[in-house]
């Protein structure tokens, strides 16, 4: 009976601290979804994910929203590769405004898996029950990966807007010399100011540009470093400090890794 004590499929509206992995399908999202400082219209259903330790449930407008929810205790995966692999699915760290919005075809695929799991839970438990359920969960997660990739592409207007705001935020950070006081910008700092989760930001950027958030930060660092090295007389240490590095050696190492030249060699090429 261990399967039933560790995994359950049911409706759950209340707000609570999660002790399980949660996958829930909401038939409707109220038509409008908050995104940053604005709203986007979404009338189709959505799939949400959460991991243990997150506070979930409840609705800001007080309306009761029907959820079809799968809760899985982490112990259910012990002894299976999915116990480790599940931590690699970034969407478990997304926030509610980063819901996976499903087309009718995608919804049919996901709901079929929900029903397969429900059927298995209602059957008599045997030696294969856990194997079958875990394979269905992994199948659902793999489909979710595929569908999120599609969503990043089809909602490119939103994604490109976020990319532009990221570039503006990085420019502002360095142009205002915030780096000399606060250090190099972190992924969490950028995500917080862009009103998205760090995981969603990196996954979205990777889908658009092939590069994650940290790589974008490094690209901007190198761009600003080249400007300072070619247009000012600041020493290498002063350039490193201005860009938020505590030690010039760390700056020089990153610069050479990215450009194949040391800062000194790059500067000499302009003299």
Predicted segments with their positions:
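Short acidic-glycine-tyrosine-enriched beta hairpin
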Residues: 37-49
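A hydrophobic/aromatic-rich effector-binding and dimerization subdomain
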Residues: 61-125
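An amphipathic alpha-helical interaction segment
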Residues: 108-168
């Amino acid at each position: 009976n261990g399967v039933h004590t560790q995994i359950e499929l049911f409706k759950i509206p209340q707000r609570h601290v999660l002790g399980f992995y949660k996958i829930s399908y909401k038939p409707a999202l109220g038509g409008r979804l908050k995104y940053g400082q604005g709203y986007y219209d979404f009338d189709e259903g959505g799939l949400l994910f959460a991991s243990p330790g997150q506070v979930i449930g409840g609705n800001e407008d007080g309306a009761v929203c029907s959820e079809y929810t799968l809760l899985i205790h982490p112990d259910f995966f012990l002894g299976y590769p999915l116990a480790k692999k599940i931590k690699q699915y970034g969407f478990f760290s997304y926030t509610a405004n980063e819901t996976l919005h499903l087309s009718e075809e995608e919804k049919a695929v996901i709901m079929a898996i929900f029903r397969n799991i429900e059927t298995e839970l209602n059957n008599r438990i045997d030696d294969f029950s856990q194997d079958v359920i875990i394979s269905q969960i992994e199948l659902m997660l793999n489909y979710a990966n595929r569908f999120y990739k599609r969503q990043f592409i089809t909602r490119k207007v939103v994604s490109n807007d976020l990319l532009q705001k990221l570039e503006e935020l990085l420019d502002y950070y360095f142009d205002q010399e915030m780096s000399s006081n606060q250090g190099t910008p972190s992924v969490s700092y950028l995500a917080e100011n862009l009103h998205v989760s760090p995981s969603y930001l990196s996954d979205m950027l990777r889908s658009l540009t092939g590069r994650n958030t940290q790589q974008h930060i490094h690209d901007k660092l190198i761009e600003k470093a080249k400007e300072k090295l070619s247009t000012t007389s600041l020493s290498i240490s002063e350039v490193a400090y201005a860009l938020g590095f505590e030690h010039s050696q760390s700056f020089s190492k990153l610069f050479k890794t990215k450009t194949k030249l040391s800062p000194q060699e790059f500067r000499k090429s302009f003299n």
